[in-house]
Amino acid sequence: MKKGKYIVIEGNDGTGKTTQVELLAEHFRKNGQAVQIVEEPGSDNLTNSTPVANELRKAIKNGSLERSPEINVLLFSAARRELWQKKIAPALNKGKIVLSARNYFSTLAYQGQGEGIDSAEILRLTKLFTHERYMNPDVLIVLVTNHDTRKKRIAKRGALLNPDTFESRNDAFQNTLNNAYAELATKYNLPTIDAGQSIKEIHKQLIDIVKVA
């Protein structure tokens, strides 16, 4: 099933994943390559998602909907299955470059280290709901940052009218996530980029990594 190329940019909220995915897409398209962007667990832009994944995303992001970490894992897994079957796999089969803001590494960080779910169970469910190809991207890059830098970046967005389930968590939880992403990158020997740099510099480093992958 190799055909296309699957590239994932990971990192905590506020590290600039979506911006960098869009810049990479522009870079590849200028070079005549077909690109499919996806956003996990869904997106306001249906070209980057599916209706079912978006409905699951609404439940996931609903901060007033009480649920267990186990339910969060199942909701994310269901959204991934939908994205894999309807967006990612078809695009790869057509030879496209798939650029994703997040994949299951976010669940390893958020639900694994953040909410205490065993990582082996997360991996088992991800494999059950998706595919080996999904679990092994051609390139997976982690944008890392410290707590203070992340807070400053998010503050530039302005006040959130309706913070979601995870945006509303306290500083201790957010710091756990920052550390989780750095630890996962080390564990899986993944390239990292300091998200505290300028957008232009981050993009340049991403291009350099993707070129040699």
Q: What is the predicted role of each segment?
A:
Residues Q33-H131:
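ATP-dependent small-molecule kinase phosphotransfer cores
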Residues K17:
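Conserved lysine of the Walker
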